[in-house]
Structure formats: structure tokens, C-alpha cells
Amino acid sequence: SSAASDVYKRQLVCLTALSAHAQWKWLNPLECGFPVIQNQGWTEEIGDRYVRLPQRAEGKVRKPVWDLSRNSAGLAIHFFSNAPELKVRYQVSGPLNMPHMPTTGVSGVDIYSIDSDGQWRFYFGGYPSGDTLQYHYTNIGKDIYHDRGYEFRLYLPPYNTIKWLEIGVPENDELTFIPVSPEKPILLYGTSIAQGACASRPGMTWGTILQRSLGYPLINLGFSGNGRLEKEVLDFICEIDARLYILDCLPNLTPKSKDEITQLVSDAVKQIRATHSSPILLVEHAGYSNALADDTKLQDYVRMNEGAKKAFEELQAQGIKDIYYLTREELGLHPDAWVDYVHPSDWGMETQANAVERKVREILRIPKGDLSTTMPVTQRREPNNYEWQKRHRDILSLNQSNPPRRVILGNSITHFWGGEPKGPSVRGMETWEKIMRPAGFHNLGYGFDRIENVLWRVYHGELDGYKAEEVVLMIGTNNIGINNDNEIVEGIRFLLSAIRQRQPEAKIK
């Protein structure tokens, strides 16, 4: 009958829908058993929520700051997957967009992959809409070295609060979350510009661009309209042991006089310096797009920058060390690099990120050259043998708990010799136990490493926190056939300079 036929059709549609649903498995990052929210700070307190200040900050910081701290600006989830496509679905609690900023920028997410040679790829997953926002990323290729897929970085909404989030993969594919990085972060305290206005998507906020370029965790404490160098916020900032503090608050200090700005900047630096010796970078106001047409805007940013520069010079005269200054001219934003009068577009964000990166590389002594052998990158060429990132975490932990007298940096030839951290296989345990262990060696070899991978590891702490008597370097074999002789020699020269800066008293072999 016709009625029976209709029932059958409805059942078929239902079964088809169920079948399609069953083809995907959904994973909640917060349920994987260990902290995975990158770039957060206070992980032990808030590692189960996509927020930026701990609960105890409520009532201590002003309500607008507290409310904005519920936004997920700068936060990210890192994972490995071999899936040919990915989905992300989530809900947020605030408005999806603003008059000067689209839904993709306010409430969207971004996904990038990193292949086994450390190269990044951006994926487009559609446009989010509705109560449950969803992205679908397709055409994810295969890695040329193995079938274990890529590393992925999922960047979260800069201007909204996530209620829940899940990542989907086809049911026969794998997804493995990556634990929170143990490395010291960079901490950025700023305004709406730091929070992300008006980037078109999360990956294009200048703090996130900087984080991708440097590879260090970056805690984004940008608060729209509320980056005011307040003591109460700085109290929480001082709880974070950062490798660098960036203060970029001048655009929210417009009502202040020059002398008031000088005092605020000076007090902020002294408050941080009272508990931390890490470098502090002061960033000038980048200016306004319409400053040439509106003289009051010109006077505003000139006054603020003069006040900040005066504070910087006075602090230097007082003998406060490791403070640095980035000028408006060094930032170099073009008048067309803003969405409105003060909030940068993607172009402006990239311009600012590049300017800050140049200064940060100078401060932290992490230069990057023009040759591939002088550009620090990660790798993941042998995940069926060992996980490169896990070995890095293990080495940092071992060096901290048991500082070595000597280290050997290299590739698989040294990795699988013996010693700690233990590799997946050992081919020279007898000689290691007889010669290397009594000499106090730690094995810093990684299978399939190239010069540029060792450079990344040196920049990311494997020679920090101890004084070695000897550093043995054996690298370059895996660059043969990829790089010419000059590139290999220059890469080794570049690497040796980085080693010497971190271990000035060690004998290098």
C-alpha cells in the first residue's frame, strides 16, 4: 500500500541517517584524561574549561576583564590524526559577530596541519552558523613518510565563550590529543588588538601568528577595551613564569595624560620585575588609520608613545635590566592595514606579528636565517618508531630532574646507541654503559633529524638550565641529498653559534 511504502521510505531515511552518523566518532578534548588546552596558563585550575583566568580572579579583577577572560582568545588544541577529513562542532554563549568583525573572526575556529618536515598547511572548513557551529575539513592529504597522518592545530574563537566542543573523525581513523607543552610561555597582555580584533579568523590574530612562527606557548591576555596595566591583572600575570612578557596596552590608555602613562608603564614593569627576571617588551601604540585626517588621533598616539618612551628611559636609568622597546615606526602599519580607525585587518595583524617576531628573536637569541638549514622546524618522520615531540618532552623533564654533565646531539646514529631517555631500540648498550654513562652523558639524538630540527630543539630548551662540560654534535647526514655543501656547512655554523650561546663554558666537539 501507499501508506506502507511511505513508512518504509521513512525508515530507510532514518537508517541511512543513523548509518551516516555512525561513520563518525566524536571526541571531547576535555575527556582524554590529561590537560590539552594549549597557551592557557593556570592549567591545574582551569585546564577543563576554555577560559583564560582562574576562577579566583572573579571579584579581584574588574567585571569587564573577568567577562572577557571567559573568551578563548589564543587557546588551541593540538592533536595527531590520519583522517582524510575532520569535523569540528561546538556551541558558544555570546553573539556570533560584531559590526566590524565577522562570525569567522568572533566565533570561528581554524585548523592547520604540520607535516613530517615541519611545513604548515591551512584548511578551509566552511562558514559557521546556527546554534551548533560546525566546520568540515576535507581533502586532507597523506604524509610522504608514513600513514600516521599529520599534527593538527585547532585555534579557538577569539571573542566568544565555548560551552562545549567536539572533534570528529571517520570511525576507522585515529585521533590522538597532544598534552600541554611543558615549555615556558610568552605572555601577552594587551587590548582588543591583542585579543584579536579585527582578524577575519582565529589563526590571523597577531599573537597566534607569532605563536606559530616561534613555536613557544603564548598566553593571550588581551582584553577588549580593558588592557589598562592594572595592578590586579598584573598580580595574576606575575603568577606565570614566562620566558618573555609583552605589554601592549597603550591603545586603552587614551584618556590618560603623558605623565600618568609614564607612571603606569613604570609601575607595571617594576611589578613584574619584583618576581621575575625574564625580559619585558614594551610595545608602542601602532597609531590610527585616520591620524592624518584627524589631528586629535595623531596627538593621542604621540602623547601615549612619548609617555611610554619616557618610562622606558627612566627604567633603564634606574638600572632595571632586560627591558626592551618596540616603536611605532618598527611596527610599520600602513593606513590601509586597519579595518576601522584602530583595529588591524589580517594584513595589519601580520605586519604587527612580523615586527614583534623580529624583536623577540633578537631578545631571546633565536635568529632565523634564509637557508632551510638555518630555519628551525619540528619533524615527525618516524612516528612508527618513536614520537618526536614526546622525546622532546622527556628530554626536558630528564634534564630538569637530573642535569647532565655531557650531552650528545644527533640523529638515529646516536638516538639508538643507548642511555636516557631510552629509545625504542638499543644497538650499543655495552659501550654506552662502559664509556658514556660514567661520563655523565644524556642522549639527545633523534632518529631522522636534520640540522634544522636540532636547531629547533636547541631553541626550545634542550641545552637550558644546566652547565655541561661537553656538548658533542653529530648531525648533517640526513641533509645530504637535500641540501648542497654550502647549506650544510652554514647550517652547522649557525647551529654551533646557538649551542655556544647557551653553553658558553662547554667544550664542543
Predicted regions: what they are:
Residues 66-178, 383-384:
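Extended, charged alpha/beta regions that create polyanion-binding interfaces
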Residues 1-8:
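Short, small-residue-biased leader/transition segments that mark boundaries at the very start
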Residues 22, 100-102, 110, 142-148, ...:
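Serine-esterase "nucleophile elbow" of acetyl-processing enzymes
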Residues 128-139, 147-148, 164, 182, ...:
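A charged, solvent-exposed segment within the mature domains of Sec-exported extracytoplasmic proteins
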Residues 70, 226, 230-369, 426-440, ...:
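Alpha-helical cap/lid subdomain in secreted, periplasmic
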Residues 23-70:
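Glycan-recognition and processing domains
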Residues 50-86, 93-95, 421-433:
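Active-site-flanking structural segment that lines cofactor/substrate pockets
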